[in-house]
Amino acid sequence: MSEAVEKIRSHDKYRQFYELATKIRNQKLLADAESASLHRHKQEVADLEVKLLTEAWRSSYWTNVSRQLKSQSLDPSYACRLLKEISDTEALAAYKHFGHHYSTLNQLLTVLYMEPTSVAELLNMWDQNDVTTNDNLIQTFFHLVYSCGLYPDDELKIAQVVCYLLKLQLVKSGSQMRTMLRKETSISTRFYKYFVEQMHPTMVYLTKALRKSVLNVIQLGNFWLDVDMKQSSSRFLSDGRQNSERLPEYRALVVSKLVDFVDNFLENISLALSMLPPNLNWIVRDIFCSLYEIVDDMSAIELSHACKDMIVSNLLCPAIISPQKFGVVDNDVRIGSIVNHNLAQIAMIIQMISLREFESPPEEYREFLSQCRNTHLISEMMDSLLVENMAPDVEITSLIASGKSESDLETKSNFVGSLADANKLIKMIRETPPTTDLKISRIVSVCQKMPESFASTVEKLHVENSEDSPKLSALRNIHRKVQKSFKRTGDSFYDPNELHMKTENYGGVFEKENFDRKLREASEVERRKQEARKQKQLKETELLIMDNISSDSAPITIKASAATNAPIANNNFTENKDLIDFSTLYTTTDDVISIPSEPSKEEKSVEKPNVNNVSVDAPVEALQIGESRGGLAKLKNFSDRMKKGITQSNTLSDIRDHLRRSSSLAKQPSGMVSSASAQNIPDTEKGDSILAKYASNSSIKIEKSTFTKLTDTKSMPKNTEMSEPYYSPENLTSCRAFKDTLRKMITVLGNVSYLPKIGCRSEMKEMSKKVRLDSFLDGVLVETEHRREYGQAAQLREVKRCIELFENEGVEILMDHLVGNEVEQDFLVRQMREERAILMRKSNDISSMEQRVLLNRRLTEQILVDNLIQTFLETGFQNSKLASGKTPEVVAVGKFYSEFKFLQAHDERAEFLQNLLTYLRERLMQNYDWNFATESMIARAMTTMERFVMFAVYEIAFWPNREMDQKKDKLLQSVIGKASSSVTPVHEALKIPEHLLGEAPWPSAQAELSMLDNYVTAQEKLNCLVRCCDVINNLVALSSKNAVASADDLTPVLVFVIIKANPRSLLSNLQFIETFAGDQIESGRDAYYWVNFKSAVEYIKTIL
């Protein structure tokens, strides 16, 4: 049947028109869908980037609060309020705070971003060799200018600043290079510390290099490893159960274990060298190669060991001593004082190994250094970093950093920071002493255009209202209390205007300027100013003759004028595609992804010199900063092109100001105050420059063109198009009539959703293609008129009129070009699809970076809450001391310690612990500051409380029967250990399904289970078992497409994993979880895994 239908249709002479119209319509629908999807993805990517940078800003402030708590410069009773304010902060468009200074501040930040050497010079001049002051300066640059190094280009810029700053100060130190690095008070060493502690690639490298070795030390348990022989002997002899005659044997055991641990650390560090971040590798290598030729022989030796210190003493050893701080191990892992001591001893030995070529080690270390087998690995590692050929990634970094190659690294398109950050940055730059460096002088000159400080929204409200509102007064009272909590002199880390106020006073989004496109020659700037003045003078003339403008050009000018000057009545401003509502839009990167075809008209217009995007009064030198750079050439901000043509905003304050100006009030609107000096700031810019800065770029070009046509016809160049005939049969495909007809047919046929049915065909005479096309269009026209679609009907009549100009051969050529246009449209659709795929990948990358930021923030939150709870349990709330001088919390914890050991029944112990935790939670929440804590902070606080309380009574709770329980655990571990060497996944007693053997021996699950004994609380131990089972479940899913692990699959594999991992004290761990977490595993996933795990252990008992 289908063949018969196809045969009939093949003889239809109208078929070509039907198929062509259908294809054009399909292409139009597909192109519209792709365009809408592309626009949506661009907006989503822009919103995701702002969200990402805001989260990074919050995380940076959280880190600083944690640092101040640790240094005791912040009162713990105000910490939760600060964290709550930071967490509730949302970023707003910066121009709302800074007014007409926005573009200048934007220019300043972009110059600082593009000139890392100038930033290093500035930091070097500001260095006060004070840790607190330097850290505040570094943090401002770190999260405001470089966005915490999230994007690859940001990370490289930070690396360049660190490298150049270290070179400046190392050269100045001469033979004291290593001393400067070890003191860690100079701004270069502080910035390097920030770099290695905050950069995600560095944390990944440290995890790879140290995690296994650190876990081995943790699993050693409560065994002291002392380098000092006297201290080791003292610990041994203090135990009354030990015999002094066994002291040499004990000392040999200590030395043997320390040597084995050190060798294991060095081996893993060497194996992880390939994971060393390229930027860090480049910093050390560039410092060595740059300074080696300019220093004397003694300083060259000092330089070599200084570079070694940068890796070993300033990176590896701190991470070994504090593995949880660097994310090497989880914060839930039990690391007590003994483990901390042992890790410190190992780090000291490794440091001595790295220094032994330069200085003689102390006597107590020589015994260990002589027995270590892998001492050569450090020297080999440094030779690989400094002397051998660079890795490809390091070589690329070197080329980009030296300016020999353009950067193709992904970068951001916004700056996010607080008002305090901007004020601090401006203050420091304005106070920079005079210098002969032209770049720094230009940066200072840009900064001089702005006021000394900007006022916050709270201060602006205070200016507008003569009487303080009760709410505002309460905010200031809270602020005064918080400021008293900072126990240091100088500027507070938090600006007085940003604490305890509404969230709009925190975040600001600055769009990165593209200096390659926007900073042009001063002559071009002056020419644009003259054009603007001419347009103003001729405004009346254009209005008088507007009605006489031809229909081809008038709608463009009128539409732009109406769009620019129309009042805003509601919040539906963004529905107009020609306008952007900056109350909801931060930045839209229109050209983040470049299409390989020719740029659109809009893109070409943006690439022209644009005076409206920069300050008109900027000096020539400032306008030429970064002109030779191309790093931001891809950051063409859509909002930069559109915002200058918008003179209104739908915010309440802007509408109020517009009403005041329109009513000609003599008083200047107070809502426009944007600096600390209020209305007394002298405006150094002329009126024309301010108008030119915010004028619409597109409107200027349109008005200029229109006026030229209307008034200055003599000066116009001869129009070659008008001199040629509209329709030319001799030059058919190049004449304007052919191009117009082709364009109109594509437009009309692309909008037709229904095609006529021509049922009667005349066979009396042969019809030409032109006649058939006219008949086909008549059918479409009739259908359109019947549907009352008069606009489309008018377009169809225009198409029919244009076709009348052509002969039959011309119509056939026109049809051929329509078919050829199909190929071009397919190519454009493919380009849009490729661009959409790139945007989707970028969106995925941003989501990945956000997860990374949230992970770091969660680690910071855990460390911070742990410090707060430890203070709470050790000292309590100082304002609630009892007559004994102790707080109720301290008394309750002491009572728990003294009575817990007398309880024998498991239920009594569990209930006693739960009662204490309930009481401590109630006491904690009675503190006003903890009412501001988030749910995650409270949950972490309860976990920390339980861990802190149980740590002191852990052995009593874990082995209630002491020696009897320990013997059972050792016996089971011994039996499992013997079986472990002979058991394989195909052992007949295990009965593991054959389709699961491809993932054997499940090493990830074994590694997770081996951590069981390193946790303190029952819930943490249960979580460890759940993660082990989850790993097995995920591996089972790899065995087949739709594999879901049932109990029959999970239990045999779990038996094999338990035998191979052979965790310590397995029976006591199960009993401990049953006692103190039994009520929490009644149902759900945890209960399912818990039952399967106990079944696996019971089965092991039967088969061994």
From Swiss-Prot:
Kindly give the PROSITE patterns that the UniProt entry links to this protein. Answer: RAS_GTPASE_ACTIV_2 (PS50018), VPS9 (PS51205)
Q: Where is this region: Disordered?
A: 663-682
MF term (GO), any: guanyl-nucleotide exchange factor activity
Annotated VPS9 domain residues: 966-1104
| Localization per record | Membrane; Cytoplasmic vesicle, Clathrin-coated vesicle
Annotated positions for site Arginine finger: 182
Please name the SMART domains in this protein's record. VPS9
Stretches assigned to the Ras-GAP domain: 156-389
Pfam short name (any one): VPS9
Keywords linked to the UniProt accession:
Cytoplasmic vesicle, Endocytosis, GTPase activation, Guanine-nucleotide releasing factor, Membrane
Task: Report the principal subcellular site.
Answer: membrane
Task: Give the UniProt record's GO annotations in the biological process aspect.
Answer: endocytosis; regulation of protein transport
Q: Which domain of life is it from?
A: Eukaryota
Q: What does this protein do?
A: Acts both as a GTPase-activating protein (GAP) and a guanine nucleotide exchange factor (GEF), and participates in endocytosis. Acts by regulating the activation of rab-5 by exchanging bound GDP for free GTP at clathrin coated pits.
- Quaternary organization: Interacts with GDP-bound rab-5. Interacts with alpha-adaptin.
Regarding protein family, the annotation reads: Belongs to the GAPVD1 family.
- The identity of this protein, by name, is Receptor-mediated endocytosis protein 6
